[in-house]
Amino acid sequence: IYVDQCKLKFYELSENTNPVTTCTDYIHANYQNDITLSFLCELVHLNRTTLNQRFKQQLNCTCIEYLLHYRLKISQELLSNTNLKIDDIANQCGFKYGSYFNRQFTKCLGISPSEFRKNPTGYSMFEGDKVMKL
C-alpha cells in the first residue's frame, strides 16, 4: 500500500497537467503490473466516463484499450528481438494468462504471436501516438 501511495504522489496532477498524459506516462512505466481503470481514475481525480472521453478525444481509444495496445506493442518488440517463450513475454507485458494474451494479440493483429515471430514486419496497432482502429 505504501508503494502505491508513493506512486500516486509521483504522478499526482498539477493544475496544468493533462490527465491523459499522466495516465499514459504511468502506463508506460508500469505496464507489466496490474493496472485498473479505477486506479487510473484515482490517479488523475476523474470519473471513468470523463477519463475515457478524454482518451477517446486525444488518442481514439479508451484508457483500457490504450493499456492493452501498449502491452501488445511491447510484446511485438519482444517477439521480434528476443527468444523468450511466448508465455514469458505475455507475463512480462502484464498479461496474467498466456491464453488471454494469445487471443488479444490475434484479435488485434490478425496473426498469432508465434506466426508474428516468424515474420514480424508490416504489423502495427499504432499510428504515431494514436491507437489505430482495426
How would you describe each model-predicted region?
Residues L8-I35, C41-V44, L68-L84, F126-G128:
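A short, Lys/Arg-enriched amphipathic alpha-helix from helix-turn-helix/homeodomain DNA-binding modules
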Residues R103-L134:
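…primarily DNA-binding HTH/wHTH and HhH modules…
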